[in-house]
Amino acid sequence: MKAESSNESFIIGQRVHSLNDSRRVGTVKYVGDVEGYSGTWIGVDWDQDGDGKHNGSVNGVFYFNGRSQSSASFVRSQNLSRGITLLQALELRYRTISTKDEEDEMYVLSAGNRRVSIQLLGGDKIQDKLSRFEELTSASLSYLGVSSLGVSSDLGSILPNLKLLDLTGNLISDWEEIGALCEQLPALTTLNLSCNSLSSDIKSLPQLKNIRVLVLNNSGLSWTQVEILRRSLPGIEELHLMGNMISTITSTSSSDDQAFNSLRLLNLDDNCISDWSEVLKLSQLPCLEQLYLNKNKLSRIFQSVNGTESSEKGSDPFPSLSCLLLGANNIGDLASVDALNGFPQLVDIRLSENPISDPVRGGVPRFVLVARLTKVQVLNGSEVRAREKKDSEIRYVRMVMSKLNDKSGEIELLHPRFYELKKLHGIEDERASAENSGPKNIASGLISITLKCVGPSMGEKPHLTKKLPGSITVGKLKILSENFFKLKSIKPRLFLQEEGSPFPTALDDETATLLDVGICDGSTLLVDEES
């Protein structure tokens, strides 16, 4: 069953797709004549840049504003589809015989915009089961051109057991239609409306008491609309809002309202939030356990701003938050890392693709982050085991001791956990004085490191374990490595291999000591060659 066009007039704002490609979706922006061409034309602004030919102007004549220079085009009405009903889409997806290509395209889109394939094992038996709609518990109708429920549809009796419905990339825009859909499906708990251009006018929306997971990625929503929506979502537990260009989190609710009291996961990945004060407006959500803020524009984290609405007096911010994902932002200071210790339950943190976690951009190695984060159990997706935690804290303390003079105020300001960790691990001051700088003291300052040759031109060489003073420089160790491994005409480059880190850390500062860069007893260094 293919959606067909008709001779009915198209209207401004209507969602349509190309008759021959249901994935080519757009919005009608103009209906009328085009100078130099006969007949009536439909001006469409396509969702994907490049699907059009211009920006809404032709031969110097302006007709409508396109989103970009290549998002707009003029199309004859017979080449556009207004879409099909939900029941027609169900028939198309589950009651027609699928070709191999169509089966390859059958998938459910996860909340994180990843495809989860549906494998049709058992062939005819599964096809027979799927064709009995009353047995369906999940349905993927993505990119089928669904635009409405249809006239006099009784979805409740047709789909009594449907719990998950994926309507990604369709033509739905009317919130009243969405409300009616949820009311008619009594078992529905998960609804994915990603990549539908949803109306900014949200009114007459009923209470969607059964919806637990709502996915609205790339749907053009502002936070003001989210605040209106939340009044109809008393039981919502997961809300996904990726790619909506949200930059501010405003509140339209009164102080008496209990907004999102059951919300456990909020996904704000790939938005435009740059000020941590906006994030702090979420800090009193009582059940929020997971907050995703990857790919935003955050540069700094702090606890509160002089009694702002970020937190109520006497209460901890984010009291239930255990997972905070901040990958691919602009965070570059250690004070922001330290601020995360103020979240009482936070154990899973992502800081990858930030300047602070990239030593090449002036950041710090993984062990420093592990040591400074009091409760961390998972960092950048890798588990922090007890051994790594202990080793990182000891390395960190020794690194600080090698760098700073004994100025307690300065140390406490720059390294808030230093004295706590020094006491925890029983680390004594190791600065040599005139009377205790003899051979015994020098021996006690030696650290055992393992060197591994990995350069492609170095050949196979056995690993070496050496005891060296922590005070020697990286440059000196490079020279020693040349001697240890008899490297002729090869300039070595050293890397520190850290547990839990997917990539080794380059040691390029030749004046830094081993203690400066966090090398301690048991560390492994890779000896590579300069490219």
Swiss-Prot record:
<dbReference type="InterPro" id="IPR001611">
    <property type="entry name" value="Leu-rich_rpt"/>
</dbReference>
<feature type="repeat" description="LRR 2">
    <location>
        <begin position="159"/>
        <end position="183"/>
    </location>
</feature>
<dbReference type="GO" id="GO:0009507">
    <property type="term" value="C:chloroplast"/>
</dbReference>
<comment type="similarity">
    <text>Belongs to the TBCE family.</text>
</comment>
<dbReference type="InterPro" id="IPR029071">
    <property type="entry name" value="Ubiquitin-like_domsf"/>
</dbReference>
<dbReference type="InterPro" id="IPR032675">
    <property type="entry name" value="LRR_dom_sf"/>
</dbReference>
<dbReference type="InterPro" id="IPR050836">
    <property type="entry name" value="SDS22/Internalin_LRR"/>
</dbReference>
<dbReference type="InterPro" id="IPR000938">
    <property type="entry name" value="CAP-Gly_domain"/>
</dbReference>
<comment type="subunit">
    <text>Supercomplex made of cofactors A to E. Cofactors A and D function by capturing and stabilizing tubulin in a quasi-native conformation. Cofactor E binds to the cofactor D-tubulin complex; interaction with cofactor C then causes the release of tubulin polypeptides that are committed to the native state.</text>
</comment>
<feature type="repeat" description="LRR 7">
    <location>
        <begin position="318"/>
        <end position="342"/>
    </location>
</feature>
<protein>
    <recommendedName>
        <fullName>Tubulin-folding cofactor E</fullName>
    </recommendedName>
</protein>
<dbReference type="Pfam" id="PF14580">
    <property type="entry name" value="LRR_9"/>
</dbReference>
<dbReference type="InterPro" id="IPR003591">
    <property type="entry name" value="Leu-rich_rpt_typical-subtyp"/>
</dbReference>
<comment type="function">
    <text>Essential tubulin-folding protein involved in the tubulin folding pathway. Not essential for cell viability. Probably involved in the binding of alpha-tubulin in the multimeric supercomplex.</text>
</comment>
<feature type="domain" description="CAP-Gly">
    <location>
        <begin position="32"/>
        <end position="76"/>
    </location>
</feature>
<keyword id="KW-0143">Chaperone</keyword>
<feature type="repeat" description="LRR 6">
    <location>
        <begin position="285"/>
        <end position="308"/>
    </location>
</feature>
<keyword id="KW-0963">Cytoplasm</keyword>
<feature type="repeat" description="LRR 9">
    <location>
        <begin position="474"/>
        <end position="497"/>
    </location>
</feature>
<dbReference type="InterPro" id="IPR044079">
    <property type="entry name" value="Ubl_TBCE"/>
</dbReference>
<dbReference type="Pfam" id="PF01302">
    <property type="entry name" value="CAP_GLY"/>
</dbReference>
<feature type="repeat" description="LRR 1">
    <location>
        <begin position="84"/>
        <end position="109"/>
    </location>
</feature>
<dbReference type="InterPro" id="IPR036859">
    <property type="entry name" value="CAP-Gly_dom_sf"/>
</dbReference>
<dbReference type="GO" id="GO:0009793">
    <property type="term" value="P:embryo development ending in seed dormancy"/>
</dbReference>
<feature type="repeat" description="LRR 3">
    <location>
        <begin position="185"/>
        <end position="213"/>
    </location>
</feature>
<keyword id="KW-0677">Repeat</keyword>
<feature type="repeat" description="LRR 8">
    <location>
        <begin position="344"/>
        <end position="366"/>
    </location>
</feature>
<feature type="repeat" description="LRR 5">
    <location>
        <begin position="260"/>
        <end position="284"/>
    </location>
</feature>
<keyword id="KW-0433">Leucine-rich repeat</keyword>
<feature type="repeat" description="LRR 4">
    <location>
        <begin position="233"/>
        <end position="256"/>
    </location>
</feature>
